[in-house]
Curated annotation (Swiss-Prot):
InterPro entries: PCRF (IPR005139), Pep_chain_release_fac_I (IPR000352), Pep_chain_release_fac_I_sf (IPR045853), Prokaryotic/Mito_RF (IPR050057), RF-1 (IPR004373). Disulfide bonds: none annotated. GO terms for molecular function: translation release factor activity, codon specific. The modification N5-methylglutamine is found at residue 233. The gene is prfA. NCBIfam families: prfA (TIGR00019), PRK00591.1 (NF001859). Methylated by PrmC. Methylation increases the termination efficiency of RF1. This is Peptide chain release factor 1. GO terms for cellular component: cytoplasm. It comes from Bacillus licheniformis (strain ATCC 14580 / DSM 13 / JCM 2505 / CCUG 7422 / NBRC 12200 / NCIMB 9375 / NCTC 10341 / NRRL NRS-1264 / Gibson 46).
Length: 356
């Protein structure tokens, strides 16, 4: 571990030199690339330097015990040794986590797709609750939400809604939301007061850059049609809605949220690129992970990950056995307590795999 940390520190120092090189300063692409790499390494280097300093102090303190000391001084040195050993143990744990390979998609924006599943209109209303929850969470983080496509029902729910959240590290926080979300509550239309169970599925895709997914125009079929509102009625006499079909993979994306066909096509291309990138990522991950399961789930969108129980104001994340009696707060976007617990569990699982 120490050899690896030394090489990381050497690379960090080299990057500092490169970032002051006039040739790099005048090359925006290199400057951006090196700045990001330096930023990614900075925390590891800072913790490593604290670890090294504490180790040197511990060595000096142990050497002092070999000298002639009065009883008071000896006790002070022993106390210092004990404190330094605790600090080194804590820093070692931090370094182990920092050395876990980082998900290359973590810094990206995220495209989220929510669909009402089992439960009819109640599932569509729950999909609307989830969309609002993620929108509020994004707002609390200072991120921006942009709707790409929405299929609204007559009662204000969503059969499907696709939206992008733009913000540094958005994917790193929201990628754990992949899966089936279950709601237990009494529907407004239920006169008997019986609790119904409905589900909605959430898919989280990292936004893919053009350089990451090579899509040729000849591989895309473009269809245009008149956009429609709730219930399917036409709301636009112009052919502004766009449907893109990627012929090699069969991935289909529609967008009718904008009045302009050009803007709808741009939005649809972003979603198409993300879905194709995600498809390749899923295939590669499945091959790599055949015999491994993450503690927070496989990312399978059919996997039930969380239950929202309205009568008891309770949220349960089934992957880590976490239960919180704060449903009202969570639906207002206060998701950090759940997401932080998932990240800790995921890191512990990866650390265990790395050490096995």
């Amino acid at each position: 571990m120490l050899d690896r940390l030394k090489s990381i520190e050497d690379r960090y120092e080299k990057l500092n030199e490169l970032l002051s090189d006039p040739e790099v300063v005048n090359d925006p692409k290199k400057l951006r690339e090196y700045s990001k790499e330096q930023s990614d390494l900075q925390e590891t280097v800072e913790v490593y330097r604290r670890y090294r300093s504490a180790s040197e102090q511990l060595s000096d303190a142990k050497a002092m015990l070999e000298e002639k000391l009065d009883s008071d001084m000896r006790e002070m040195v022993k106390e210092e040794i004990s404190e330094l050993q605790e600090e080194i143990e804590s820093l070692t744990d931090q370094l182990k986590v920092l050395l876990i390979p980082k998900d290359p998609n973590d810094d990206k924006n995220v495209i989220m797709e929510i669909r009402g599943a089992a439960g009819g209109e109640e599932a569509a209303l729950f999909a609307g609750n989830l969309y609002r929850m993620y929108s509020r969470y994004a707002e609390l983080q200072g991120w921006k939400t942009e709707v790409m496509e929405a299929n609204m029902t007559g009662t204000g729910g969503y059969k499907e809604i696709i939206f992008m959240i733009n913000g540094n590290g958005a994917y790193s926080r929201l990628k754990y939301e992949n899966g089936a979300h279950r709601v237990q509550r009494v529907p407004e239309t239920e006169s008997g007061g019986r609790i119904h169970t409905s589900t909605a599925t959430v898919a989280c895709l990292p936004e893919a850059e053009e350089v990451e997914v090579d899509i040729h125009e000849k591989d895309i079929r473009v269809d245009t049609f008149a956009s429609s509102g709730p219930g399917g009625q036409s709301v636009n006499t112009t052919m502004s809605a766009v449907r893109l079909t990627h012929l090699p993979t069969g991935v289909v994306v529609s967008c009718q949220d904008e009045k302009s066909q050009i803007k709808n096509k741009e939005k649809a291309m972003k979603v198409l690129r993300a879905r194709i990138y995600d498809k390749f990522q899923q295939e590669a991950q499945a091959e790599y992970d055949q015999n491994r399961k993450s503690a927070v789930g496989t990312g399978d969108r059919s996997e039930r990950i969380r239950t929202y129980n309205f009568p008891q104001n309770r949220v349960t994340d089934h992957r880590i056995g976490l239960t919180i009696q704060k449903l009202d707060q969570i639906l207002e976007g206060k998701l950090d307590e759940v997401i932080d617990a998932l990240i800790v569990e995921d890191q512990a699982s990866k650390l265990q795999q790395a050490e096995s």
